[in-house]
């Protein structure tokens, strides 16, 4: 075979490989939103305008063997792209079918079977620029795997996760259960363990919600116990009222306790959401005391925010 034929066949093979590698199509989704927020008390003060700045690239398909494959990449301005996976933020690959369940590999931005449940009943209202640190949880996020078992019984979801650590980082494993077999009721339990050299930490979450008529009630508690260091506990509850198909009102409260501190961080918020003609307007007022476990004025912070999002 002469060199010209070899070059031609090599180019054809490369073209076929490239074609098969990019056989799936990716779609792009974003959101149109604008808002204003105002902080007072401890931390940063003043008003700030905001707008949606996140794009999600996603694609999916099915192999000849009947395995569903989906891929997701998120571009989020200002998020932690400095970890080396930039320009992307969260990104994951998902494999699933009815008999094998669902396996998710997260290169960044994943959750453990415990941390996926540890969002507080009030909706993590601490995470509003008030100066409150993120509560501790079982390690996950980068280079982690989450497996959701196929259905074992009606209305029961079982998940398991593992993060191998690496480069001296902690390894972690977790398991979680959610049962929704009673009308209006959902109950979840998650437990995770994080191991580093000479230290071990356990995180557990229990939470539940119950919808009755126009009301929804929620409770949650997460405990983080560590061999060396201070233990953490977060307790939360919420009450939501659906006024109509368009309008809802929610009140939520959280208490963050840390071993070694006599002052708890306490957060409460009231919010409302109204939807009409493809536009959703939301407003919230949030108040915190004991920020950074400080007493008096030094530990007080407030925020109000208003936002509008558009579906089209």
Which functions belong to the PLM regions below?
Residues 1-312:
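Outer-membrane beta-barrel proteins
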């Amino acid at each position: 075979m002469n060199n010209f034929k070899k070059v031609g066949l090599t180019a054809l093979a490369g073209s076929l490989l490239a074609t098969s590698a990019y056989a799936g199509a990716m779609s792009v989704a974003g959101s149109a939103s604008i808002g204003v927020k105002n902080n007072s008390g401890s931390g940063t003060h003043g008003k700030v305008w905001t707008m949606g700045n996140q794009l999600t690239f996603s694609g999916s398909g099915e192999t000849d063997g009947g395995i569903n494959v989906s891929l997701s990449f998120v571009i989020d301005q200002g998020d932690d792209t400095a970890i080396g996976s930039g320009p992307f933020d969260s990104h994951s690959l998902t494999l699933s079918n009815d008999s094998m369940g669902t396996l998710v590999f997260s290169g960044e931005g994943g959750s453990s079977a415990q941390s996926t449940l540890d969002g507080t009943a009030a909706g993590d209202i601490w995470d509003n620029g008030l100066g409150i640190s993120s509560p501790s949880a079982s390690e996950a996020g980068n280079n982690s795997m989450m497996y959701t078992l196929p259905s074992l019984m009606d209305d029961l979801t079982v998940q398991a996760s593992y993060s191998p650590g690496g480069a001296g980082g902690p390894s972690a494993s977790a398991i979680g259960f959610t049962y929704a077999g009673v009308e209006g009721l959902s109950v979840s339990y998650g437990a995770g363990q994080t191991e580093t050299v000479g230290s071990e930490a356990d995180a557990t979450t229990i939470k539940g919600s119950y919808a009755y008529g126009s009301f929804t009630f929620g409770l949650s508690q997460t405990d983080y116990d560590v061999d060396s260091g201070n233990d953490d506990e977060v307790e939360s509850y919420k009450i939501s009222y659906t006024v109509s198909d368009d309008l809802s009102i929610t009140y939520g409260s959280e208490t963050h306790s840390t071993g070694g501190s006599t002052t708890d961080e306490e957060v409460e918020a009231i919010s409302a959401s109204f939807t009409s003609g493809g536009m959703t307007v939301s407003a919230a007022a949030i108040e915190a005391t004991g920020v950074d476990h400080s007493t008096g004025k030094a530990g007080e912070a407030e925020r109000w925010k208003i936002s509008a999002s558009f579906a089209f």
